[in-house]
Swiss-Prot record:
The keyword tRNA-binding does not apply. Keywords: Ribonucleoprotein, Ribosomal protein. The gene is rpsJ. This is Small ribosomal subunit protein uS10. It comes from the Bacteria. SUPFAM superfamilies: Ribosomal protein S10 (SSF54999). Involved in the binding of tRNA to the ribosomes. It comes from Mycoplasma pneumoniae (strain ATCC 29342 / M129 / Subtype 1). InterPro entries: Ribosomal_uS10, Ribosomal_uS10_CS, Ribosomal_uS10_dom, Ribosomal_uS10_dom_sf. Part of the 30S ribosomal subunit. One of its GO terms (cellular component) is ribonucleoprotein complex.
Length: 108
């Protein structure tokens, strides 16, 4: 094993968040393809509970408080765990183009 592909982390967790579930699924597929290309074991993508934000607004500007409208935002989450990550895998993960609506968080 050479120094460029030496094991850097025994485990690397990637947490993905997005308000658009289709964008999130496309991004997880991209990451899975890239990781399988560099021979790193992967656990997931594991779907985490969706957070639901509900906002209630009164429709009328003056009277009639009973008339209300509700809006909701759903935050979708996925967790991926990479095992025995080498420097080549980290470099290939850095090159992935992530869409604007997706947030990535890395942790050990």
């Amino acid at each position: 094993m050479n120094a460029a592909n030496a094991v850097k982390y025994p485990e690397l967790k990637i947490k993905l968040e997005s308000y658009d579930s289709t964008l999130l699924d496309l991004t997880t597929k991209k990451i899975v393809e890239v990781v399988k290309g560099v021979d790193v074991k992967i656990k997931g993508p594991l779907p985490l509970p969706t957070k639901k934000e509900v906002i209630t607004i009164i429709r009328s500007p003056h009277v009639d408080k009973a008339s209300r409208e509700q809006f909701e935002k759903n935050r979708h989450k996925r967790l991926m765990i990479l095992v025995d990550v080498n420097q080549g895998a980290i470099d290939s993960l850095k090159r992935i183009k992530i869409p604007v609506g997706v947030t990535l968080r890395f942790s050990k």
